[in-house]
Amino acid sequence: MKGMHGIIFSYGEKPGLGQLTANRIHGSLPFGGDYRVVDFILSNMVNAGITDVGVIMHGKCQSMLDHLGTGKSWDLSRKTGGLKLLPAFAYSESRGVVGAFRGKMEALGCVIEYLRHIRQDYVVLSDSDLVTNLPLTRVLEAHIASGADMTCVCTSHPGESGDTYFKLDNTGRIVDTAYDIRTPEGYQSLNIFLLGRDLLLELVEDCMAHDRYSFRHNVLQDKGKELRFNGYVWDGFAARINSVQGYYQRSMELLRPEIRAELFCPQRPVYAKENDAASTYIDPSGECVNSLISDGCDIQGSIRNCILFRGVRVEKGAHVENSILFKNTVVRSGAS
C-alpha cells in the first residue's frame, strides 16, 4: 500500500525541562496556549495524508494518554488503523534494562510486531519534542526522486552541541554524522526520518539480533557508507524543546506575527484536543497587549506580552508582563 505511516517517540527524561516535565513525558508539555508539543508533529503527519500513527511511550504517560485519547481530534479514530498508543516494555526488560529505553532502535524492537503489520510502503519516524509545520509530502517526493534509502530532515539553523549534525555533499547525500561536538558545524538534525517499511524492519531486526539500540550510532553512523542517506533541508520555523529557557524563548516567539503566520498556516492547520471552555472575558477596565489568550480566561487586570492557557484569571489591579501562565493560574489583585 502506497503512502506513509507515522511513528512518534515520546519517552525518556529531559533534565533541562525540570519541573515542566515532573509529571509528564515531554510530548504532552503544554505549548502556545491551546496545544501540547506533540500536536505539531501529529498534525504534520495528518496533513500529509497519514492515517496510521503509532506513539511509542514509556514513563509518565498519563498526561499523554489523556490528551491523545482515541485520536478523534486528529481524525485518527478509525476501525482500521488510526492512532495506536504503544507503551512498550518487554524487549528492554528482556535485555535487563530498567527504566527508559537505551535508544530508538530498542524502542522499535519493543513494538516489532506492530511494525510488521504496517500497511504503507514508507514510514516517518519522529520525536515528539519538535514544534514545526513541515510539509511531509514534499519530503516524500524528494525521497523518491533521490532514490535514497533514508531521508533525514535537517536545518541550517544552529542548535546545541549535543544535537546530531550532518555534512552533505553537493547531491544532498549525508557524508558524515557527528554529535556531542564542541563546535557544531553542518546541518542540525530535526530527528525526522523517512524510509521504506522493509528497510526499517531489516534495520530493527539486525539491531535486535546484535543487542544494538542506538539509531544515531548503529544506523546513522554505522550504515552511512553501506546505504544512501540523504538530507532534506528545512529552514522554516523549527523549535526543539529541551530546556526551560528554550521553552520560554520559543514560546515567546509566537508573539511575533510572522512566526504565527508560518506555524499556523491555513494550508496545514495544527489540530489539538477539543475543549468546551467558555469564551474569554476581558473586562472593560482590563488591558491586553500583544498576548495569546486561550478560552475560558477572565482578564480584569493588565497583561502585556504574555501567553495564557485555559482558565487563567487576572484580577483587577494585577499587572503581568512577559510571562507564560499555565492552566487555571490566578493572579491576585495588586500583583505585578
Region roles according to the model:
Residues 1-253:
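Unchanged
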Residues 1-10, 198, 206-336:
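Left-handed beta-helix
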